[in-house]
């Protein structure tokens, strides 16, 4: 799926707004490969509303955004990670894999801040 991210990128707006979980998963997969600040909050909300498999991949997309957008969009990424955490905190069951990925995303941002101080 990720190998076609560049080819399918032009369909991202359509995939994001789709009622089909498969198409939303395709959008998430594209954003895992090609992070876009426009969709950070959309990804953060997927953590709350999608089934665990899809929500996990939304968290991975946020982790990749933290790694790739931290220099240009650190505040937006931080806000999205915070929203994802809030959504996860409201969930009846917290997927340990999602928790781990979001913790790593937060560490990525903090690492960048610490590197900038040195």
Report residues per predicted region:
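Eukaryotic acidic, Ser/Thr-rich intrinsically disordered low-complexity regions
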Residues: 78-118
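Structural detector for internal amphipathic alpha-helices that build alpha-solenoid repeat scaffolds
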Residues: 1-3, 14, 22-35, 45, ...
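Alpha-solenoid helical repeat architecture
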Residues: 15-19, 47-51, 85-89
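Amphipathic alpha-helical scaffolding segments comprising HEAT/armadillo-like alpha-solenoid repeats
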Residues: 4-15, 36-47, 68-83, 115-118
């Amino acid at each position: 799926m990720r190998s076609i991210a560049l080819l399918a990128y032009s369909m991202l707006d359509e995939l994001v707004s789709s009622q089909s979980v498969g198409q939303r998963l395709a959008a998430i997969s594209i954003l895992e490969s090609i992070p876009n600040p426009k969709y950070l909050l959309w990804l953060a909300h997927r953590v709350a509303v999608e089934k665990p498999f899809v929500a996990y991949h939304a968290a991975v997309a946020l982790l990749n955004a933290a790694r790739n957008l931290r220099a240009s969009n650190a505040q937006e990424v931080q806000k999205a990670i915070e929203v994802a955490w809030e959504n996860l905190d409201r969930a009846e069951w917290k997927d340990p894999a999602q928790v781990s990925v979001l913790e790593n995303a937060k560490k990525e941002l903090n690492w960048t801040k610490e590197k900038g101080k040195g």
